[in-house]
Amino acid sequence: MKSFLAASVVAVATMAACATPARAAGETLTVCLDENLPPLSAHHRGKPDSGFDVALAQAIADRLGRPLRIQWFESKLDEDSSPALEANALLSDGRCALVGSYVLTRDSLVAPGVKTAKLPDFDGATRPDRTRRVPLGVLAPSQPYLYSPLTIALGPQAVEKARDRHIAGVGDLAGMRIGIESGTLADAILMTFDNGRLIDDITHLVPGRDDLLGALERGELDATLLDLRRLDAWRAAHADSRIAASGYFYPIGVNRGYVGLAGDEALLGAVNKALSDLQAAGTIASLARAAGLTFLPPREPAVLGDVWQKILGK
């Protein structure tokens, strides 16, 4: 009888172990993506969903043998929120298993300093969803799949000015009309460069209110320092744009990857395997090109340390 019971326990355990992967394989993979982050991800009424991250999420879901669902959200940061808290709230509330294109820095992955956070606005949100607070977990990253640097973009008049000189660093912008968005990383870089050498050349604009690239296009400014993704998006939306890429990338950039919750090692391990396979096959680079995104492979360190210390120390 004991032998029969032992055999039964082994059989049940074996069946459960065999059933778990099959069940996981058929389970929908839900990925949260920002609805207004072209050409990484875009979701607008009346238009098909688009972007590099949409295609990459589908490729990963295919590798895992799971159907894909995108949970779109809108990031409207205020003084009580941050990208890290928004991502954590979405994951901790079970809205998705992964958040895509997450910026991998040490600060963005530390345990939250608060116990709860509000959810960002998301597709399907109810009125109570917009006010309630979610108990937070701890974030865990995947391996990176994309490197995002800051680059110098030049307006049409600056292209003429810089024709005889190569833009090899932010110091080469001296004497140009530099536009920058207040409170951004690029603002800190330019304002502190060489003990403030560029300060008199800088005009500050308000993010979300002033049109930085529009002013550059119209010739009201000569140059700016911004996320390469934004330049890609502008040029894709304005086929006749005269804004030129300088080809210069600021030496401190960040990797992007997925982020999930600590404790979901099985999913993150499977995603990392899929990312490695897709990277080796050249698929990730191909998806980026198809989306109009300048692809730069991830760089070491995978997770950037103290950004401000690196900038102020340069």
Regions inferred by a protein language model and the residue ranges of each:
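Ligand-binding clefts/hinges and TM-proximal coupling segments of bilobed small-molecule sensing domains
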Residues: 161, 165-168, 185-192, 242-244, ...
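Periplasmic-binding protein-like
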Residues: 34-36, 127-151, 228, 235-275, ...
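A conserved helix-loop-strand patch within extracytoplasmic ligand-binding domains
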Residues: 104-108, 117-183, 187
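Extracytoplasmic small-molecule ligand-binding "clamshell" domains
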Residues: 25-110, 205
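Ligand-binding cleft/hinge of the Venus flytrap
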Residues: 41-44, 57-73, 116-117, 156-159, ...
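Hydrophobic residues within well-ordered alpha-helices
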Residues: 60, 85-92, 152, 173, ...
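A ligand-binding cleft/hinge motif common to bilobed small-molecule-binding domains
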Residues: 92, 100-131, 189-193, 217-252
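Extended ligand-binding regions for polar small-molecule ligands
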Residues: 54-64, 154-164, 171, 176-177, ...
